Amino acid sequence: IGEGGAVVGNDEELMDRVWSYHNCGRQFGTMKKPGNNPIVGNNRRMTEYQAAIGLSQIKRIESDTQKRGENAAYLTSRIKDIPGIVPHKLYEGVTRAAYHLYPFRYKKEQFNNVPKEKFMAALRAEGIPCSGGYGPQYRDGLIEDFLTSKNFTRSFPKARLDQYRKELNYPANDQLCQEAVCFTQNLLLGPKQDIDDIANAIEKLYQNRDKLA
């Protein structure tokens, strides 16, 4: 793991594309494609400092994972009966999760059709950081790059590629992305009172949904 060397040039667009490639394919500078990750890229960076921190954190991985799991279960128990809030659930047979994110679905119809963005802003105003999670990544531009690449255009007729584009539709995935609200893993490492604060804030927003509309 790691990166080294340098790339220099006088073509701004090319240099921006090089930067994007080394940083997960994310947009930068003159990159004007839709989505957060318009091209295929990588991320191989690691410093000695990061390695030292990582090694020390390994000692806590079991206890932190246990703590996040317990707090996630408690949070679910607190918010599962709030109308319009649908906590995530683990598949049958799954004994624990890492909880990189704790997601739940926000059904705006139960909140007087208050948009998700407004709900999240109100939640942040209560001191609870949150985000909308990931968008529909199949629309970020990576697939289109593959479809227009030399390998694909040589291997498949245009009609087949156009058909694939037409069939590229995942409404259930899109709905999940539209409804998702997420907490980052660090929120699950605090004491029980922190989890109560999160649940109480969501309950407060529901009770005052008329004022949010």
Which sequence ranges carry the predicted segments?
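Glycine-rich phosphate-binding loop of ATP-grasp-fold ATP-dependent ligases
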Residues: 2-7
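PLP-dependent aminotransferase class I/II
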Residues: 10-213
